[in-house]
Amino acid sequence: MLLDVTLIVLCAGNSTRFEHKTKKQWIRIENEPLWLNVTKRLASFSQFDKIIVASHEDELAYMKNFTDDFTFVKGGDTRQKSILNCLEFVTTKYVMISDVARACIPQSVIKNLLDEKENADCIVPVLNVTDTVIYETNTINRDEVKLI
């Protein structure tokens, strides 16, 4: 059963904070580029009506060689512009957006978000922090910090 949900995966960035000569989306996981691995993994979690991948303009044609299962859209020069470009191709009532760098999202998080989709205008996952958190020189109580 389709859920009236479009999945958008953002991978149009230049990976400037990544500080590596290869863009994040092209790092390999199990012999696949990260963007393909993450998108296929997320797609396997639910029956999305459509899956849209935002790509850098220079990489669009190459990405299309990997699969016909997704709609590829030219990303913008900011995350917000990439989202806007993708939204032009959405025909469903609901949209789920993920960044390609979120390769390890548990299926339970996706399921919980989809289960709650009709209960709010916008839903984001709020995850507990398990690492030590330091702000300036002070260790912060990790129970007071959340990952979004």
What are these regions (language model features)?
Residues 79, 100-104:
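Acidic metal-phosphate-binding loop of nucleotide-sugar-dependent transferases
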Residues 26, 72, 122-123:
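Conserved beta-strand scaffold positions in the cores of enzyme catalytic domains, especially
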Residues 34-92:
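Conserved N-terminal catalytic core of the sugar/cofactor nucleotidyltransferase
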Residues 95:
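Short aromatic/hydrophobic "clamp" motif used to bind/position activated sugar donors
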Residues 105-148:
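Conserved core of the sugar-phosphate nucleotidyltransferase
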Residues 9, 35, 86, 98-99, ...:
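Residue-level signal for inorganic ion chemistry
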Residues 2-57:
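N-terminal glycine-rich phosphate-binding loop and ensuing alpha1 helix
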Residues 20-23, 40, 64-66, 108-110:
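Short amphipathic alpha-helical segments
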